[in-house]
């Protein structure tokens, strides 16, 4: 997620020694994060001692919920990370760190995790955090009466699925004493601690009141002061936070639906950090005063074409490979996103263990693509629909894909829908091709391989290509049980290679996060996981 010369290392930005002129599932609109030193209301500050806004433009709408049990969208997940903690947590660079658990051990058979809890933690209402809160929090999420939005991160726990279905009250969570909890799994799952850093695994009090969503009680570094829906959320720092209180007194998350508005505010100096809209990437990179402010990092995010392998010609791997070969992906990346990413030759981002950075993507070759179609029995080409969301830049990208495919006798009809309708159609198996992106839930190659290509996840689970291969499934399943990191990475590489050879989906590129940062901001780290930035290390100097 150095110095201010971010062209050398665009990952972390420190404050300069002098003042400079004032002047990012979820992708193009704006959630404004405002950092102030007092509990000042939203708006422009005039005194030099006060602070301005910090914008994260990946989110443009209100959080759906501040209750971890119902935090299924990115804005909610980020807000939950401010207010609550899990046993583990993500750093901005996606490393998994101890959270409410200071350490843990795993049994030799990989089934029992013993978590040792911190003794210096209190909820914001003053209640000490204890091991019983782990058991009650997990039981609450899994209780059918809670109607939690996304409980699958807890499914590895023994008895969790039966508990969630209401057929059992037995759950593999045992409190040994106030500071020790043992979690037993159904089967070994080596990356289980990463799942515990997700919002749904956050700790909440034993008793949840009716106003919990509007007045949440957590252990996190921030406390909610005010939530003006569709306008802003105001947070005050938790001075007693066990991990060290934030340096800034107040954090305000303003909702800005229009990226152009966010850009204008940044250039007016009223916000501190801007998530650069995709369609403005080149403008920011090519303008000297703007480019000096840029900070970037590879995100755990893949753009791809889901190819429904159960429909007509798309059942044939030669047709799927022809689609991939008909696309000049480097040119698409350069012209539409100003090179803001890296061409993909698989689904695992290069920064994750298991990625094969030496694998080359299929080269653009329209003649070879037409030959493959002929071999597959389609000498006159094929007709398909390409679905995409109405959110920029997907329509433009879809039009470019349409033009390339036409050169190889792949005739495309573009179907634009709102994101929810498009997603529902794809998961129901109603699409031929669907243009999508995938943003990691947790930083592990498994979170790309399993959701996107495992047969158990077809349809509603997210495998909208309906790809199914027994060898691929076996490799991923074996990786769940493998405790040796090097061997697990090799299983990931083998699965990714097989999925790419079979073109279970057509990977396009891995995306880069790109922010603009005001010169008075210190310690900002570009987050590569959605809930990795909690603003603990950010400081604001004089303008």
Where are these regions (language model features)?
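N-terminal lobe/hinge region of extracytoplasmic solute-binding protein
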Residues: 58-108, 139, 215-219
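Surface-exposed, Gly/Pro/Thr- and Asp/Glu-enriched linker/hinge segments
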Residues: 43-54, 97, 123-187, 206-225, ...
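Append "and occasionally in soluble cytosolic enzymes with long acidic Gly/Pro-rich linkers
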Residues: 237, 315-403, 407, 468, ...
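Ligand/substrate-recognition segments at binding pockets and active sites
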Residues: 47, 353, 374-441, 513
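Extracytoplasmic/peripheral linker and loop segments enriched in polar/acidic and small residues
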Residues: 43, 173, 407, 411-422, ...
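Gly/Pro-rich hinge or "lid" segments in bacterial periplasmic/extracellular proteins
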Residues: 157, 167-174, 185-246, 250, ...
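Long beta-strand-rich cores associated with HINT superfamily self-processing modules
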Residues: 515-543
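Ligand-site clamp/hinge motif
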Residues: 210, 238-284, 402, 411
């Amino acid at each position: 997620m150095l110095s201010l010369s971010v062209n050398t290392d665009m990952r972390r930005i420190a404050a300069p020694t002098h003042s400079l002129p004032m002047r990012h599932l979820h992708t193009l609109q704006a959630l404004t994060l405002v950092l102030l030193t007092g509990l000042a209301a939203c708006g422009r500050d005039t005194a030099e001692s006060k602070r301005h806004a910090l914008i994260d433009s990946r989110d443009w709408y209100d959080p759906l919920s501040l209750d971890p049990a119902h935090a299924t969208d990115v804005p909610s997940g980020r807000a939950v990370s401010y207010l609550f903690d899990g046993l583990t947590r993500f750093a901005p660079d996606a490393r998994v760190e101890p959270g409410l658990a200071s350490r843990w051990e795993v049994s030799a058979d990989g089934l029992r995790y013993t978590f040792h809890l911190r003794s210096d933690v209190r909820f914001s209402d003053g209640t000490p955090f204890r091991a019983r809160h782990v058991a009650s929090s997990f039981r609450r999420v899994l209780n059918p009466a809670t109607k939690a939005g996304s409980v699958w991160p807890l499914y590895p726990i023994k008895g969790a699925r039966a508990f969630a279905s209401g057929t059992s009250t037995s759950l593999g969570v045992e409190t040994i004493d106030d500071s020790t909890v043992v979690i037993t799994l159904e089967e070994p799952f080596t990356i289980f601690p990463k799942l515990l850093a997700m919002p749904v695994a956050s700790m909440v009090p034993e008793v949840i009141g009716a106003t919990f969503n509007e007045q949440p009680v957590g252990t996190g570094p921030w406390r909610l002061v005010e939530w003006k829906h569709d306008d802003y959320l105001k947070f005050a720092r938790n001075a007693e936070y066990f991990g060290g209180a934030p340096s800034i007194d107040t954090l305000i998350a303003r909702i800005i639906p229009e990226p152009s508005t966010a850009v204008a505010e940044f250039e007016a100096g009223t916000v501190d950090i801007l998530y650069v809209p995709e369609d403005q990437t080149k403008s920011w990179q090519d303008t000297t005063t703007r480019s000096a402010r840029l900070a970037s990092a590879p995100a755990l995010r893949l753009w791809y074409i889901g190819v429904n392998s159960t429909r007509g010609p798309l059942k044939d791997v030669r047709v799927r490979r022809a689609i991939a070969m008909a696309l000049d992906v480097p040119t698409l990346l350069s012209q539409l996103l100003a090179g803001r990413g890296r061409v993909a030759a698989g689904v695992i981002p290069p920064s994750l263990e298991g990625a094969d950075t030496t694998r080359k993507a299929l080269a653009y070759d329209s003649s070879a693509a037409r030959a493959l179609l002929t071999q597959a029995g389609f000498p006159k080409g094929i007709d398909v629909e390409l679905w995409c969301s109405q959110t920029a830049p997907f329509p433009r990208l879809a039009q470019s894909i349409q033009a390339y495919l036409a050169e190889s006798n792949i005739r495309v009809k573009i179907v634009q829908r709102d994101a929810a309708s498009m997603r529902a159609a794809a998961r129901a198996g109603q699409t031929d091709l669907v243009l999508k992106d995938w943003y990691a839930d947790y930083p592990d190659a498994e979170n790309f391989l399993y959701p996107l290509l495992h047969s158990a996840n077809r349809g509603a689970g997210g495998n909208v290509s309906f790809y199914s291969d027994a060898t691929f499934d076996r490799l991923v399943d074996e990786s769940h049980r493998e405790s040796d990191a090097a061997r697990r990475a090799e299983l990931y590489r083998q699965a990714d290679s097989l999925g790419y050879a079979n073109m279970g989906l057509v990977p396009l590129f891995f995306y880069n996060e790109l922010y603009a940062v005001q010169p008075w901001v210190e310690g900002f780290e570009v987050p590569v996981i959605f809930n990795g930035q909690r603003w603990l290390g950010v400081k604001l100097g004089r303008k």
